[in-house]
């Protein structure tokens, strides 16, 4: 069991779709550090997906840094969003 994870494929699309099929995983496909920060702050994403064919090494390092250094905001609207996502998982 892990707190966070990082997955990579060619575009990041397929791996993010697959990761989001796993109960409890909230995987965000990010192509820049701003997206990584926002997916952590707003969606409490616990997995980061990136596309190796889409982004270079330096950009990838910036994305990973933003993802790992950002905490969930705990804002009410964001908590409500996470609760709705959890309900969708239970409905499967």
Language-model-detected regions and their locations in the chain:
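C-terminal binding/interaction regions
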Residues: 33-92
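Mid-chain, well-packed structural core segment of small domains
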Residues: 7-53
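Short alpha-helical segments enriched in small residues
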Residues: 1-4
